[in-house]
């Protein structure tokens, strides 16, 4: 009963907050013994294209940086997914550092996540710094021509040297890292180390992990 009251209060708060910004939020309730299963099923039933998840707050030793629920959702769904760890209000962020893997432009979900990130940066009024390979940079600069924002572009294609970002990032910066599921076009083996790097070297900054829509089958056994 107590959990149901908390659930209703959180949903009502979200609806009220959205209304205060002239947005409409449709609250959905789903009863399921498995939280990941519930979210995955709603994604399919409602035709959801974008998913925002907060980074879990694990207590003690956890087997996964992202958490078992998030890992399950990523493995069994194929929507643009943003995993967000907020350290400061987004309105106070001065720069968004966006790290993009090579061949990201070849993924089917490339235009979708680029538009989402671009809108957030544009609406925040903050500066963007994109780190990408030369080939990928061509596509990002095309977007820049169509929708100019305050931005810089820096060549980056060595994910084995990802920790140079710890020297680039400053206070009031948010770090965006575009990821990939295993065995997809833009996957790099060193991506498996990114969660550990973030946990160890970027504790003072907000960050967002972006998992784009990608070609290939997902495991639908829970749907």
Each model region followed by its residue ranges:
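Short, small-residue-biased leader/transition segments that mark boundaries at the very start
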Residues: 2-6
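A short, well-structured beta->alpha microelement
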Residues: 25-40, 134, 150-168
């Amino acid at each position: 009963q107590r959990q149901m009251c908390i659930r209703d209060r959180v949903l009502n708060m979200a609806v009220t907050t959205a209304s205060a910004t002239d947005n409409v939020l449709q609250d959905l309730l789903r009863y399921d013994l498995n939280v990941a299963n519930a979210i995955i099923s709603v994604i399919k039933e409602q035709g959801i294209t974008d998913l925002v998840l907060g980074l879990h707050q694990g207590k003690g030793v956890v087997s996964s940086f992202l958490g078992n629920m998030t890992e399950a959702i990523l493995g069994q769904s194929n929507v643009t997914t943003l995993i967000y760890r907020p350290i400061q209000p987004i309105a106070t962020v001065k720069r968004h550092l966006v790290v993009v893997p090579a061949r990201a432009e070849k993924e089917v979900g490339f235009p979708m996540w680029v538009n989402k990130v671009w809108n957030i940066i544009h609406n925040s009024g903050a500066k963007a710094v994109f780190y990408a390979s030369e080939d990928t940079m061509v596509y990002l600069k095309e977007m820049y021509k169509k929708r100019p924002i305050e931005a810089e572009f820096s060549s980056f294609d060595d994910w084995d040297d990802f920790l140079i970002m710890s020297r680039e990032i400053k206070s009031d910066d948010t770090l965006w890292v575009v990821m990939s599921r295993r065995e997809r076009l833009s996957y790099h083996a060193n991506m498996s180390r990114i969660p550990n790097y973030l946990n160890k070297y970027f504790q003072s900054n907000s960050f967002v992990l972006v998992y784009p829509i990608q070609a290939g089958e997902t495991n639908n056994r829970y749907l």
